[in-house]
Amino acid sequence: MRRLMAVALIAALAAAGTAAAQERKVKVGVLKLTSSAPIFVGVEKGFFKAFGIAPELVFFQAAAPIATALAAGQIEVGATGLTAALYNIVLQGEKLWIVADKGREWPGYPLVGIVVQRELWDKGEIRSVKDLRGKRIGLTTLGSTFHFHLGNILEKEGLKLADLKVIPLQAMPSTVEALKGKQVDAIMVPQPFPGRTEAEGFGKILAWAGDLYAWQIATVFYGKGFAADREKAVDFMKGYVKASRYYHDAVLVQKDGRVVPGRNYDEVVQITAKYTGARPEIIKIGFPYQDRNGRLLVPDIEKQMTWWVEHGFMKRAIPLKEIVDTSFVEAAIQAVKE
């Protein structure tokens, strides 16, 4: 009997050792934002682990440094906004691939808020986008997703970026602090920051940017080396697709034209609160939209590059076939059944 137990124990330890050896670490660059919820859900629910992937989350303060870190080989996967910096890294000869959806600015789904000083709102000084003319508006960096989004919103309203004083403040927390300290009149920041400004009484959400201009703001992108390891890259995407579906069914469900809590809503709220450090009631203000299976709005990526070229932030647009690869997400969708 003892001999049998010893054999069984050795077999169990060997199996555990094999499983540990098969679990492949992947460094993933992310921001502590509500839009990163699918990544957080995938980690907490073990969806990546189910396919032998152990994500190591590396947190950043803004989107552009994630692209730089990916190019430098400090991370293998980036999950954040599409910036001019990312496109320019590719133009400079580095290879990376945009592979999946990680968030869209979409009507009815809060992501980036245009937030104004509460005092200016109460005085009636800023009540619309057109009232931003001549005002100081803070954002992370020039060439950021916020820069692109603000420019396109202004153009729809008959304004130009030159009609405002755009102030780059490098990181999201410092952008919020600038509004609090009245160094700027308005800011553009993603959830949970808009909700926090209102909860603390110094900010007022003027509008949700996705209600004014819809686009593919954020994606998952792979570094050259990671993409070359096809099996590992597809396995990561399998976990991501599973997490994306879970996220979608929990927090993006609509009924009669309104977003309503779906299955596992409270669980996803708690997971997101844990990783962002925001209170659950702030998280509940809303989650950004993304495709249930993680599929990209590919034509929108081309539109973005055209805009950056027109505004002097890129020398030329990159052919989509040289920067977008949807084969990873399509392979994962086929492999991960409902």
Segments (PLM) and residue ranges:
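Bacterial N-terminal signal peptides that target proteins for export
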Residues: 1-6
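Periplasmic-binding protein-like
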Residues: 103-113, 198-226, 237, 244, ...
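Bacterial N-terminal signal peptides
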Residues: 7-16
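Short, glycine-/small- and polar/acidic-enriched structural segments
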Residues: 22-161, 165-169, 185-191, 206-214
